[in-house]
């Protein structure tokens, strides 16, 4: 089955997104005070990690207006500088919820369904899939929601396999949701999550609501706990990806308040060394949320 090839290379974009046109509108709505604070928060975390670069974007949910957009890259061992030329590759972890939403749209799966991910290693005719904890014996039998919370690639793949059965059916559903499989940059990924947050036209409202409950669970019980705020409930997803040069992209994308979203945020950090899942990006997300709710 070729679904796995499509899933593992799911770096898709939104068909209707004219990025250049939207950038002009977004930039004119920047909140300079917020922009300055987010720059401070991001730079502190990058310095702490000695990271190569980082990005943070804040979007107003209902209007889609960008309130802050920062890109920083390492200038030398102690300083960072503003940059627009940053990695745009999106992590599989952030794409997982989109794949799950597509599967929910078929009516063939629900988040409470169980899936056996075994010892964390799953072989198909095309490739061997490994969950991040395979060396600890895997997660065994878990629900789809739990699989999403722990970023189980096996759980998401098996969910896609059950829901669609063929690559053609999977692509057809993504096309129906106006998601294309070309290149998805950081701003477009945030736009996609923002559409989920406001119950946009991406999917049936009941399925979007189910996914939003799952994204809350990611933060309360899954790998997104570093994004948890004491001031307001948040929802979102972590992601990690190793680049060809050996460095890692770690990300968190989410929104708040979870039950009445006002703002969505994406944080992306490019660093060398072990990634610690999306924890580092989640911490930046939390600090931004806390500042905006002080």
Annotate the PLM regions:
Residues 22-25, 30-34, 52-92, 101-271, ...:
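Beta-lactam-recognizing serine transpeptidase/beta-lactamase-like catalytic domain environment
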Residues 39-48:
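Short, basic/aromatic recognition patches
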Residues 96:
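Short, conserved phosphate/pyrophosphate- and ester-handling motifs at nucleotide-, phospho-/glycolipid
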Residues 2, 10-23:
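Bacterial Sec-dependent signal peptides at the C-terminal "C-region" and cleavage site
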Residues 47-50, 294:
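Surface-exposed helix-capping loop/turn segments at secondary-structure junctions
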Residues 282-294:
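Short, gly/Ser/Thr-rich active-site loops of penicillin-recognizing serine hydrolases
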Residues 38, 147, 285:
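A helicase ATPase "motif cassette" and its flanking acidic/Ser/Thr-rich regulatory loops
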